[in-house]
């Protein structure tokens, strides 16, 4: 993961690696902090695909980018799968790029982005979390989605968010969705434990970053 600076405000960080938490939220580490911050290499949950390097061997093991994850959370999905298989994602602060945030959708909050990101958030959970992990996180997930619904309702995008959630459930239980679901394996049980601890810890990190 590179240190991504905001195209229009290069003195501010746009992302220093990505995190994902038990609320079902993905967020950019270090967003809006000064460029000088986050200067140490460290492990992160995933890399923003806007500027990242991936080993070919990892894709050969976990599978490629999922075309069903078009536009949003596709990099979190790759990072999640990598974690399941025991790989680690690292932040490299010496790699600096300028990033035009929301370049595909045109703005931070709009119907296109809200619809796709909410859809993909459901699909992400379905694909990567075993049933037991979903149940373990269910109270946090319900809270996280309730907060998002209220947030987008205030912005006049509540209906679009709910519509996207419906699309996410339909995608998850469609033939294409089931085809891409990560199959649970006991040999990865320890990795799931590590992931779960990260999901809980990242809820607190969300308050800081």
Where are these regions (language model features)?
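Non-catalytic, C-terminal membrane-associated alpha-helical segments of glycosyltransferases
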Residues: 134-209
């Amino acid at each position: 993961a590179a240190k991504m600076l905001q195209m229009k405000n290069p003195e501010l960080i746009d992302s220093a690696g990505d995190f994902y938490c038990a609320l079902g939220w993905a967020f950019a580490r270090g967003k809006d902090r000064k460029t000088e911050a986050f200067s140490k290499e460290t492990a992160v949950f995933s890399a923003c695909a806007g500027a990242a390097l991936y080993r070919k061997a990892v894709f050969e093991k976990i599978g490629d980018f999922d075309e069903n994850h078009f536009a949003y959370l596709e990099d979190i999905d790759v990072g999640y799968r990598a974690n399941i298989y025991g790989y680690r994602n690292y932040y490299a602060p010496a790699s600096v790029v300028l990033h035009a945030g929301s370049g595909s959708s045109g703005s931070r909050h709009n119907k296109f982005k809200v619809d796709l990101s909410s859809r993909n958030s459901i699909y992400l959970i379905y694909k990567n979390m075993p049933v037991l992990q979903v149940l373990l996180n269910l109270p946090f997930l319900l809270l996280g989605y309730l907060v998002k619904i209220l947030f987008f309702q205030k912005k006049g995008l509540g209906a679009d968010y709910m519509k996207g959630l419906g699309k996410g459930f339909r995608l998850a239980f469609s033939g294409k969705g089931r085809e891409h679901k990560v199959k649970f394996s006991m040999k990865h049980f320890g990795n799931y434990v590590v992931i779960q601890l990260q999901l809980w810890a990242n809820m607190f990190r969300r308050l800081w970053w």
